[in-house]
UniProtKB/Swiss-Prot annotation:
This is Glutamate decarboxylase. It is an enzyme of class 4 (lyase). It comes from Saccharomyces cerevisiae (strain ATCC 204508 / S288c). Residues 35-60 are annotated as: Disordered. It catalyses: L-glutamate + H(+) = 4-aminobutanoate + CO2. The keyword Iron-sulfur does not apply. Its cofactor is pyridoxal 5'-phosphate. GO terms for molecular function: glutamate decarboxylase activity; pyridoxal phosphate binding. The modification N6-(pyridoxal phosphate)lysine is found at residue 318. InterPro entries: Glutamate_decarboxylase (IPR010107), PyrdxlP-dep_de-COase (IPR002129), PyrdxlP-dep_Trfase (IPR015424), PyrdxlP-dep_Trfase_major (IPR015421). The gene is GAD1. Its EC number is 4.1.1.15.
Amino acid sequence: MLHRHGSKQKNFENIAGKVVHDLAGLQLLSNDVQKSAVQSGHQGSNNMRDTSSQGMANKYSVPKKGLPADLSYQLIHNELTLDGNPHLNLASFVNTFTTDQARKLIDENLTKNLADNDEYPQLIELTQRCISMLAQLWHANPDEEPIGCATTGSSEAIMLGGLAMKKRWEHRMKNAGKDASKPNIIMSSACQVALEKFTRYFEVECRLVPVSHRSHHMLDPESLWDYVDENTIGCFVILGTTYTGHLENVEKVADVLSQIEAKHPDWSNTDIPIHADGASGGFIIPFGFEKEHMKAYGMERWGFNHPRVVSMNTSGHKFGLTTPGLGWVLWRDESLLADELRFKLKYLGGVEETFGLNFSRPGFQVVHQYFNFVSLGHSGYRTQFQNSLFVARAFSFELLNSSKLPGCFEIVSSIHESIENDSAPKSVKDYWEHPQAYKPGVPLVAFKLSKKFHEEYPEVPQAILSSLLRGRGWIIPNYPLPKATDGSDEKEVLRVVFRSEMKLDLAQLLIVDIESILTKLIHSYEKVCHHIELASEQTPERKSSFIYEMLLALASPQDDIPTPDEIEKKNKLKETTTRNYRGTC
């Protein structure tokens, strides 16, 4: 994120400092801060923006004299409590849970530099082990030698994968004596922004393929005919879109690429490669779904077991379950990584071969990743992901079968649907007993208010549901679907990511809050409509009272707002049961 040092920061006025300076005799702040502020006032400075004379620093300037470490900690700690609860941040794919043992390892290795392979050889060895483990998880060919590296996340990994494809394309075109100045790359409009960043930063034409409702808001392989040409350096295929969690089909994309190339025997650029973006799916697929499950879904070959997949990335800090700041990128064979992209350094005492966009960086995330592999093993990861998938499917089931709000929700994601007939089961238990019968994907639920709901309550915006849930602590994004050919991108969805810490009890609480808030909105809508009908009969006082009561009701912790009919019945009951017992004077 970019930050500017603008007028707000340059002209920052320390209100608290001014108040304490003027009212030095009053205890307005904690003891240490109060003492610091009063002492600064005795130094004779009249300029409250002069941070060099203040014990309480301007927030945007380095103070001349610092505060005690304990006090500094408390001030910053208190300020950061304003952030949301990470566990209730259901917008994020990034892991927020860490075991005590992992924290201990992190603390012990907090200052190790991953770039310093001579000083920390065992840290480099753990990185090597992780690369080997991932290569096997992604079905590397025993006859090939995969090569890879740790990155700061999938964003950097995507850049490296794209660069490698670009270099190979340039070599092919130049060896054929053809122009190599207009490379392009293919991806669906459901791509994450990092994929588009690659094209802009490294001067590659971005060919975004619009999606549709029919394609489940992911890449339709048949659309590639309109986008692929001899200058196509490769195709990004997303194993788990951030919008809806769908897995784009590597096999079908590869088949269409073969058909296109067969129609153009004159091309010098053949065997157009695929980079599999497994930011989420890179861990979910190998641990969460058996080979036969993926085969039944038509995606038996999704990794290095398909010859067109030359590289793949994943995020360790997502479903690899590490702390933030770790990604991985691998190439199926060393020959796919051009020599000019590699650097051999003798900078820190040893010889190191690197390919990356950064140098010095923490190494503790790699330690955390290796710890997870060792402590969880295949069975531990599988159990966590199966649990997350079950909770996500159960959440979808409850929305679709809500007794309180029947027919008010539509599910846009697909993991709750049967592979055989795209339907949901009659019982939620079927998700637990027969998970292999349902579509693979990332454990998330993308849903929206139904067409039926919008027809009945057209003025109720879906975005307000997201805002009101925030008041309960839940962070759930409301966003438009990706660019589409059928206008479906004009629709918005709410998305809930089911990370490992999102257990069934929390999901049930979320369902209750969604139903409660939406019921309140419906009753508010009905009350407003009733009020409008009677607007000509309303006094100014009654109109004011109505607005106050409506806003108060929305802020109320009570589940329901009474409907106009309920209010009328209540008033009539009050009239018939109220007696005046006041006697004559």
